[in-house]
Amino acid sequence: MAFSLYDASVANYLQTLGAVSGFLQRGLVHFCEKNIDPDTMVEARLAPDMLPLRFQIISVAQHSRGAIEGVQSGEFRPPAAKTPYDYAGLQGLVAQTQEALSAWTPDAVNALGGRDVVFHLGDHKLPFTAEGFLMSFSLPNFYFHATTAYDILRTNGVPLGKQDFMGRMKMKKS
């Protein structure tokens, strides 16, 4: 069995998005049990110079759904840092991202291989191939922001463990 662009990207995005959805839900339950308004967590951050939970979740969506759409269009831009969301809105964004990525078939994603993609960052333009963009830029950023979101919740008392981050693994079928 060949390992495809779909396997390397969308399948991994969906696994981790499932985990992100799960740990956001665990966070909601925890905050409600502790009489903490979950919306106050939207601006929580690990350090003063890091962007908040809101931006981490927006970036998870941008570096998954947005990355595949960027490969399709040939252009990718970073997310807007100031997009307003409450906690429920962040959960909805993850659900919408999962739904949109689930609509992509392996054949459709694999057909994007070899395309040119330009990452626009201000006045800078960084040229990539689809494979280079997804593997060396999109996936590392996706995992960074998913991990940072997990860490923000964890440092705010949400009882999370490694399995909460791992999500549903792709086990061998007997």
Locations of regions flagged by a protein language model:
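Alpha-helical scaffold segments that form or flank carboxylate-/histidine-based iron centers
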Residues: 2-15, 37-62, 80-90, 122-141, ...
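Structural signal for well-ordered, non-membrane alpha-helices
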Residues: 17, 21-28, 65-68, 95-102, ...
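Surface-exposed helix-capping loop/turn segments at secondary-structure junctions
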Residues: 27-34, 104-111, 155-160
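Short secondary-structure junction/hinge motifs that connect adjacent elements
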Residues: 28-48, 112-119
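Conserved alpha-helical segments that form or flank metal/cofactor-binding pockets of metalloenzymes
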Residues: 49-77, 97-100, 105
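Short helix-capping/linker segments at secondary-structure and domain boundaries
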Residues: 66-73, 151-159
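Acidic/histidine-rich alpha-helical segments that form the ligand environment
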Residues: 82-153
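C-terminal end-helix/capping segment
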Residues: 154-174
